[in-house]
Amino acid sequence: MKGLFSISTAIMLSCASFQASSETINYYVIAKQATPFQIESPDKTHKGIVTDIVKAVFNGSKYDIDYHVYPFNRMISLLEQGGEANWITYGSPNWGGVQAENLSEMPIYNVKHSLVTSMNNTFDFNSMKDMDEKVIVLLHGFNYPQLVPYFDNGNVEELRVKDYKAAFRVIKKLPGETAFVEMQSRIKYNLSQQKLNTDAYRVQSFSSVIPDYPIYLAFDPKMDADIQAFINERLKTLKSTGKLDDIIHNYI
């Protein structure tokens, strides 16, 4: 009996030691609008470029990932209030705010923006002059300072939609009058996921208006210094071994 008690006690102490040694990383995911960077799933088998990178960073480590999925504006509001300790998501200096305060040492991806129109009554885009008296379709929650002057002076109209399906539907129904502006990677991914005929849409570079820029992992401004150093070292390893590029190519 004494031996059984000793074994049970040892097991309990071992479990307690494991729990004490593990630390939680609170990973914030944008619901619905961030594919292919973050793709949420009801069964919590989350994936996506950023999500897979985060998983790879902490794979085999003492850190556990706790997922938090919110609509974009709600997520930003929570993070501005402090969020959960040692939170992580993705961001860029170009975005400002909480997604730009504390970033990884190296970027994880370079963003390009594109303008999508219907091939039915399409038009060439060379400058914003080509958008005079037309409508630019944007997703809710995503703001582009470069476009604000054109919206403010009334030369271009702004139309917000809730998701990619709605955006593609608008430009299909109003060919020649509308264009959807979004990250090139998101456009290609969502056209494919929705099994739309890519020949029905024209994708043109929008880099002359929104210059290309890098995105990074974004951290809690108060993140534990050891955790942040660990992440940065793992990112360097993922890059040097080609794993980072492999993850990106799985989606794009």
Regions picked out by a protein language model, each given a short descriptive name:
Residues 14-17:
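N-terminal signal peptide c-region/cleavage motif recognized by signal peptidases
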Residues 22-99, 160-161:
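Extracytoplasmic small-molecule ligand-binding "clamshell" domains
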Residues 31-33, 110-113, 196-232, 252:
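Periplasmic-binding protein-like
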Residues 32-34, 42-44, 93-94, 118-122, ...:
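Short coil/turn segments
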Residues 51-61, 214-249:
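Extended ligand-binding regions for polar small-molecule ligands
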Residues 54-62, 106, 130-132, 140-164, ...:
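Ligand-binding cleft/hinge of the Venus flytrap
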Residues 59, 73-86, 102-103, 164-188:
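Short helices/loops that flank or line small-molecule/ion binding pockets
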Residues 68-130, 141-144, 205-209:
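Acidic, polar ligand-binding/catalytic clefts
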